[in-house]
Amino acid sequence: MTQALYLISAAQLRAARALLGLDQRALAERAGLSHPTVQRMEASDGVIRGNIDSLGKLVFALESAGIELLGDGATSSGLGRGVRMKERGAAKADTDSTLLLRR
C-alpha cells in the first residue's frame, strides 16, 4: 500500500468512488468494510482519521480498481485523464483572467 493511506481526504474518497461509478455500499463490499464505516469516512472533515486497517483496506480497494491517489505536490504516473484541485492562489488568478476575457 502507498503513503496515500495516511493522506486520503474525504473529498478524495468521494471523487474516487464517483470515478469508479460505485455507491457507498459497493465500495464497502469491495473493501471488506461495513457501509456505516464508509459513510463515516466520507463524512469526515479533511483527512480521514480512523482505524489504520480500515484505511488500508479502503486504499487497497481503490488502487486495485485503478485509482491513483495523489497527495499535495505529487505528480501522476497515469496516462488517463484526471481532475485535481488547483492551489488557492492559482484559482484566484484564473478567475481574474477569465473575468478580463469576458469584458
Question: Can you describe what each PLM-predicted range is?
Answer:
Residues 67-103:
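Short, charged recognition helix plus adjacent turn
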Residues 10, 28-31:
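Small-residue (primarily alanine) positions within well-ordered alpha-helices
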Residues 6, 20, 51-54:
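Short, conserved glycine- and acidic-residue-centered signature motifs
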Residues 52-69:
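DNA major-groove recognition helix of helix-turn-helix/homeodomain DNA-binding modules
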Residues 33-50:
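Recognition helix of helix-turn-helix/homeodomain-like DNA-binding domains
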Residues 16, 30, 41:
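Residues in the recognition helix of alpha-helical DNA-binding motifs
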Residues 1-18:
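A short, Lys/Arg-rich alpha-helix, primarily the initiator
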Residues 13-26, 87-88:
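Short basic helix-loop element that most often maps to the first helix and adjoining turn
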